[in-house]
UniProtKB/Swiss-Prot annotation:
This is Eukaryotic translation initiation factor 3 subunit D. HAMAP family: eIF3d. Residues 166-177 have a biased composition (Basic and acidic residues). It is found in: Cytoplasm. Component of the eukaryotic translation initiation factor 3 (eIF-3) complex. Residues 305-319 are annotated as: RNA gate. Its main location: cytoplasm. Belongs to the eIF-3 subunit D family. Pfam families: eIF-3_zeta. Signal peptide: none annotated. GO terms for molecular function: mRNA cap binding; translation initiation factor activity.
Length: 577
């Protein structure tokens, strides 16, 4: 073949200005080129050669399939692509490719759990996507076996449910808790105070003075301060002793002091500490406030939540309510509170050296113990009635009388003088369970990393520890003993072991917790002033169960005194049937 010169090639090129296929009348509309399209097409790029199909390369479903932001990259004219498809000469619908790859048939995931693909798993079907699905552990990855009944907020696809929340679900609603007391229609709301306002209050007071003391104290057993050997752990024993937590208005000593006009405000250390530490509280509670003349009594209802010891109330992932019959029912808040209250009662009685010859008697006997009615001996307890000055000026004096409690007495190792102790107990239920708040394993870390263990407890139980510290300070206790009690078996809540006891000076512990007593006294004075400005009657201060808000209600005079009426009505109805 003869070679072609460059000049011949150039001369053979079309002489027209444009290049490409020749334009015919079939591909023009009034002389303008066009392409067939559908009105349902999404207008986008004219051509995107980098985009993959919905199923990824080779039609395989991939991770992109589960991207919540994924949207088919439809281009202009895609809806009518069949018009440009190549017409096959013969039917190839029966043609198939034999794959030599093995399909996975596993239907189990993790430790015995049924595997349902969740968001983030590869190769799942679109209709089984569940977002944060039924088998997702709270705070875990998609598809892991967890607490199926805890997090069923819907996702996308076939398991569609509620709306999606923001980044890391920052705006999702928290778990809803029930109020500690039912708000009745005839209650009148007077004030609503948020915790931010309470945190700004401040009132400096004195250290208080003792008015009188009742009861007796046993000496603390220093053997519990020693770290127990792992092979010989101390078991928490059931020690039946009579202890009392009488409300303010039912205390015979406070009634006598009120008749003598000793103070304006009367309270117990449990009620007062809850009010002073209210900005740290998360769980709901309520305090009954009774104004009689110029006197104010801070009371509690029978079987109120103030008597219960909370567990991990301030944890970022606090314990959650479990369904009835669930294996995690022992780790729900109400069960943990009962367990912690039981532990504190028995621990305080077990660490005493009970000896009639070596006990410290107060000026008066226990005002609540009646030997003719009680079958159990009285617990080691001293009730000290103390007086504090909450006056803003000398012209308007306001004093507070509070009943404080001391649990034990101990000899000072240096001076040999008696020191008053308060004894409390922290409890560990399961460091790996939901609601543990990232706590360390006490059995392995309490000795080597004691500071880290205590710091974690300060974070997870800020309100509880603050209340104990306030009670110790207003009682003028020298040392606050904290016991560390754990379950013998994490799955059982009826057997416990004592892992160690640590003592602190209450004011040093308060400074570590950033606890301000002047802020607490300011809160007390503010709430009391609200009631003194009102008429005589009964009021209820309620902590909102789901918001950091306190509400003050005015209630009828007979409220909370007819708790047994409901039972009588039910019995009458049954008899009529």
């Amino acid at each position: 073949m003869a070679p072609i010169s460059l000049s011949e090639i150039i001369s053979a090129l079309p002489s027209e200005d444009s290049w490409g296929p020749t334009t015919t009348s079939e591909t023009t509309l009034n002389g303008v080129p066009y392409a067939p399209y559908s009105k349902g097409d999404k207008l986008g790029r004219m051509a995107d050669w980098t985009a993959e199909g919905k199923d990824g390369r080779d039609g395989r479903g991939g991770r992109q399939q589960y991207n919540r932001n994924y949207r088919d990259q439809q281009v202009y004219g895609a809806g009518t692509s069949s018009l440009f498809a190549v017409q096959l000469a013969e039917d190839e619908s029966t043609f198939s490719v034999v794959s030599n790859t093995r399909d996975s048939t596993k239907t189990r995931f993790g430790r015995g759990g049924t595997f349902t693909r969740g968001r983030g798993q590869r190769g799942g079907r679109a209709d089984t996507r569940g977002g944060r699905g039924q088998f997702q552990r709270v705070g875990g990855r998609g598809g892991q076996q967890g607490y199926s009944s805890y997090d069923t907020r819907g996702g996308r696809g076939g398991a569609r449910g509620g709306r999606k929340f923001g980044w890391k679900d920052y705006d999702k609603p928290q778990r809803n808790r029930d109020a500690s007391v039912n708000i009745k229609p005839d209650w009148k709301m007077l004030e609503e105070i948020d915790f931010n306002r309470l945190a700004k209050l401040n009132l400096d007071t004195d250290d208080g003075e003792d008015i009188d003391s009742y009861g007796f104290l046993y000496y603390y057993d220093r053997a519990f301060d020693k770290q127990p050997v792992k092979a010989a752990e101390r078991k928490l024993n059931v020690v039946d002793r009579a202890s009392y937590n009488v409300t303010t208005s039912s205390d015979p000593v406070i009634q006598e002091l009120a008749e003598k006009d000793e103070a304006t405000i009367f309270a117990t250390d449990s009620i007062l500490s809850m009010l002073m530490c209210s900005p740290r509280s998360v769980y709901p509670w309520d305090i009954v406030i009774v104004r009689q003349g110029n006197k104010v009594f801070l009371d509690k209802r029978d079987n109120a939540t103030l008597d219960m010891v909370t567990v991990n109330e301030n944890a970022a992932d606090a314990p959650m309510d479990a369904s009835e019959g669930s294996k995690d029912a022992i780790n729900q808040p109400s069960a943990l509170a009962e367990e912690a209250t039981y532990i504190n009662h028995n621990f305080a009685n077990q660490v005493m050296k009970e000896s009639d010859s070596q006990k410290v008697e107060m000026e008066h006997e226990n005002p609540f113990y009646n030997p003719s009615e009680e079958t159990d001996p009285p617990a080691s307890k001293a009730y000290k009635y103390r007086k504090f000055d909450l006056s803003l000026n000398d012209e308007d004096p306001v004093h507070l009388v509070v009943r404080t409690e001391i649990d034990a007495v101990s000899k000072n190792a240096i001076s040999g003088e008696d020191q008053y102790l308060t004894v409390k107990a922290l409890n560990e239920f399961d460091s790996k369970a939901q609601g543990s708040g990232g706590a360390l394993d006490w059995r392995t870390k309490l000795v080597s990393q004691r500071g880290a263990v205590v710091a974690t407890e300060m974070k997870n139980n800020s309100c509880k520890l603050a209340r104990w510290t306030v009670q110790s300070i207003i009682a003028k206790a020298d040392v606050m003993k904290l016991g560390f009690v754990s379950r013998a078996n994490p799955k059982l809540n009826d057997r416990h072991v004592i892992l160690g006891v640590i003592g602190w000076k209450p004011r040093d512990f308060a400074s570590q917790m950033n606890l301000s007593l002047s802020n607490g006294w300011g809160i007390v004075r503010t709430i009391v002033d609200m009631c003194l400005k009102r008429e005589e009657g009964k009021y209820v201060l309620v902590k909102d169960p789901n918001k950091p808000i306190l509400r003050l209600y005015q209630v009828p005079a007979g409220s909370f005194e007819d708790d047994g009426e409901g039972d009588v009505i039910e019995e009458n109805v049954e008899e009529e049937d």
